[in-house]
Amino acid sequence: MSQPRPLLSPPETEEQLLAQAQQLSGYTLGELAALDGLVTPENLKRDKGWIGVLLEIWLGASAGSKPEQDFAALGVELKTIPVDSLGRPLETTFVCVARLTGNSGVTWETSHVRHKLKRVLWIPVEGERSIPLAQRRVGSPLLWSPNEEEDRQLREDWEELMDMIVLGQVERITARHGEYLQIRPKAANAKALTEAIGARGERILTLPRGFYLKKNFTSALLARHFLIQ
């Protein structure tokens, strides 16, 4: 079998993207890094996004850290997901930064969360810490769009969380709010503050927040597509 090669330009079709992702299945992160002339870090403590960046290179992703999808021309977002030996997610999945001001008139249909989750290429990666990073294998990819039930679940959580933000209750939101979608602080340090609305409608400074998919949502999603089929 010939070795895969990184895509040098963004894929032009979903089929091309999926075919490239399928070629990576079974390879270790160390093998993929070496094939592209990259050094695999010892761990992810200082390189938390390294796996995502590595796979973006292989798949020809274009967006980087921009708010559009990773494959903007296709409307597809790339999500790597660390899993255990049974294929269960090991952590929550970051979706996007939560806007804490200027939310009047925003609906679920026009929200950044829905835009990011409209079409997702999920790539499971072995994530157990007992496996050295270079030896962790890439799993089979899944191109996914939310079905009606998933869209309803996410919408209900999003509306509950956005109501709290708009009503000045952002600092009361905990990771327990939302059944499948949660909001929690997203900042490398506690000094990185952003504006939000306080309980009396005043401007306050608070930690930036991010939307995350809870493990129960991604676990059911992966189980339905990989274990049942």
From Swiss-Prot:
Alphabetically ordered keywords of this record: Cytoplasm, DNA damage, DNA repair, Endonuclease, Hydrolase, Nuclease
Transmembrane segments: none
Any one GO cellular component localisation term in the record: cytoplasm
Name of the protein this chain belongs to: DNA mismatch repair protein MutH
Function: Sequence-specific endonuclease that cleaves unmethylated GATC sequences. It is involved in DNA mismatch repair.
Annotated HAMAP family: MutH
Native organism: Shigella flexneri serotype 5b (strain 8401)
Gene this chain is encoded by: mutH
Family statement drawn from the similarity comment of this UniProt entry: Belongs to the MutH family.
CDD domains the UniProt entry points to: MutH-like
InterPro entries: DNA_mismatch_repair_MutH, DNA_rep_MutH/RE_typeII_Sau3AI, DNA_rep_MutH/T2_RE_sf, Restrct_endonuc-II-like
A single BP term in Gene Ontology: mismatch repair
Location(s) in or outside the cell: Cytoplasm
GO terms, molecular function: DNA binding; endonuclease activity
